[in-house]
Structure formats: C-alpha cells, structure tokens
Amino acid sequence: MDEIKLKALAKINLGLDVVRRREDGYHEVRMVMQTIHLYDQLLIQKSETPGIQIHSNLSFLPVNENNLVYKAGKLLMDEFDIHTGVSVELNKRIPVAAGMAGESTDAAAMLYGMNQLFGLKLKRKDLMERGVQIGADVPYCIMRGTALAEGIGEKLSSLPPMVKCPVLIAKPAVSVSTKFVYQNLKLNEQTPHPDIDALITDIRNSDLDNICADMGNVLETVTIPNYPVIAQIKEQMLKSGAKASMMSGSGPTVFGLFGDEETARRARAEMKASGLAKQVYLTSIYNNRR
C-alpha cells in the first residue's frame, strides 16, 4: 500500500459543562460529544522526500510542527523508526478554530492512516493512547460516535447512538479564543449548568425532543455577551424551525438540530440569506465507530 484516502469527521457537543477549575489551570469538564457527516479529506502517500510534507487548500494553515497532522505523523515515525517520507494532501471543509475539533480529527485520521499505510498493527485503544499526547480531543476523534468525555476531555465512555437527524452548521466571521472563554468563565451559584445526566438518559431513550430540551453549553455564558452574533444565529435557526440550537465547544460555530430534511434545507437557505454566518453547511448525525 502506497497511499490511503481518509475522511476526518467533525464533532459537535450536545452538552458541555465545566465542573471545576483545577489548581494546574486546566478545567474539568463533562461533555456529550457527537460525530457529524461534515468532514475534511486527507490523502496520505509514501514519498521519496524525507520527512512529512503537508499541502492544504487553505494557504494560512501551518504545514510544519505547529500542525497537529504533522505532530501525529512525527510521533509514529519516531516511535517506529520510519524513514520513508510521507506526503499529505489536506482538503479542509470543517470550519477552522470553530469548536468542531477540525485539527484534532485531522490528526486522528493521520494516526489511523499511518497505522494502515505502514502496517503498524496498532489497535484502536493504542491509537487513542497516542492521540492524547497530541491533543485532548484526538482520542475521541479516533473513536467517533456518541460519547461522554470527562476529566480534561480525555476520559471517554461510549454512549448509545444519537437519534439521526439533520444538523445545520453556521460559523460567523468572528474568531473566539478558547483561552479567553475559559479564563472568563465564572463558576458560581448563578452559573446555569446543563444537566448532562438527563441528556444521557434522553440519548439512551432515543428521545429527540427531550435531547433538544436538555442540551446546554455553559461556555455560552462567556461567548454570547462578548459575541452577540452567536445569539443571533441561534435565534435565526430557531425561527427557521430548529428543534434546538446551541454553540459547539468554545465556539463560535452554532448548530441546529431539525426534525426533517425539508425544514433543514429551508433553514439553510434562510441562514445564508441572513448574512449572519460566513460558512453554512447542512449535514447529519454520524454514528459509526472506527
């Protein structure tokens, strides 16, 4: 095998709660993660040129050790003493720096692809153990599906598959710093926390209406006052018939869950016409695990 082509799927958070701020500065979280059908594509090829060469359709992306794809490749090359060069064609569709684990899922695909390409015979759990060295979301992106993430996001528990439904994605032009969001998060009695356990029960019961009612993201308490366009996009989605709308991760991307394809398609057109979002995609829930 000289090349492998892979899809790197995005994630959304159906629920995101921050439990506490640790003494080391990290935050302990409880998140319900969900893979969706929106994806980047990676073509990974063996190359006569030594090292790792990355080419992307987005000129502003780093193509050196500052890219998690590069880090993932180098980690396996160093561990298994691989001297053959690797070339990566990275076609980005997932919004960048958007709370959808775009870079983490690309790194996960790189680990998976290198494992196949060089016959390393690493099992999924082996890849996940290596993934956590690259980034907290990488192990989940290797696993995929519906999962509860705890700790700093690295402790993963599989959940039953989420109900399939259309998902509308809208990313505004603003950039949101994850560091800024967590630094400005106030954890006190007034902070509205989502009920993650209730959300998990709803998922187990395949109850889309209750899932939508119990969804919540505590980080919106920081982002919405600072970036009003996030609330405007949520409002637009609900006005267009979404059963629920919420920010994913630390934002600024907003997603909406819909009961039927026709309403979702109409909502996509209305979102594009509103001018609130720079990138708009209609996709769906993805439940297959690796």
Name each region found by the language model.
Residues 1-98, 116, 120-128, 134, ...:
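ATP-binding N-lobe of GHMP and related small-molecule kinases
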